[in-house]
Amino acid sequence: LFTPQISRPFRATDHEPEIMYVYPTTAQLPFGWRWRYSGVGLVHQSNGQSNPLSRSWNRVYLMTGMELDNRWTVTGRLWKRLSESADSDDNPGISDYVGRGELSVRWNVNKDNTLGATFRSSLASSDRGSVRLEWMQALGSGLWGGKSNLRLHTALFSGYGDSMIDYNRKRTVFSLGVSLVDF
């Protein structure tokens, strides 16, 4: 399962602090869908390294989300990279690889299982972008027998931008971990 020559449990640590404003909505949409929110945000993403391994970028984004019967969720984001001077830009062209937008779909199969897919696109003539497929499964039960906030998180990623250091290399990555949700 783990081979030191080809596997690294913590190969990269990327940081992504952000600030956002979310406007809740309750608008009814066709076919039973509900528009749940819209928002705007500012995000900085960095790998925290020094040159020549340094990678970072800043962007602003618009987002929205809708749901159907608390079982299906569709969210979308469009972003614009904030310009940097050519001599301080760690990763020119990152938008052409990581993308300029994403669409996520989540399906709550039952109270213990959620399936998801996220698609990123450069929204340009190139065919770069990525796809991430995810499965989250509840682990155990919560306090006093209630719903557990712990999930086994399994993901398969294919495309560009899985990590900042390799943003311009196409990769396929299988991930397994634990997530905290609904706390």
Explain the meaning of each model-derived region.
Residues G116-L150:
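Glycine/small-residue-rich hydrophobic helix-like segments
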Residues H15-P17, G129-L133, L176:
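One face of beta-strands
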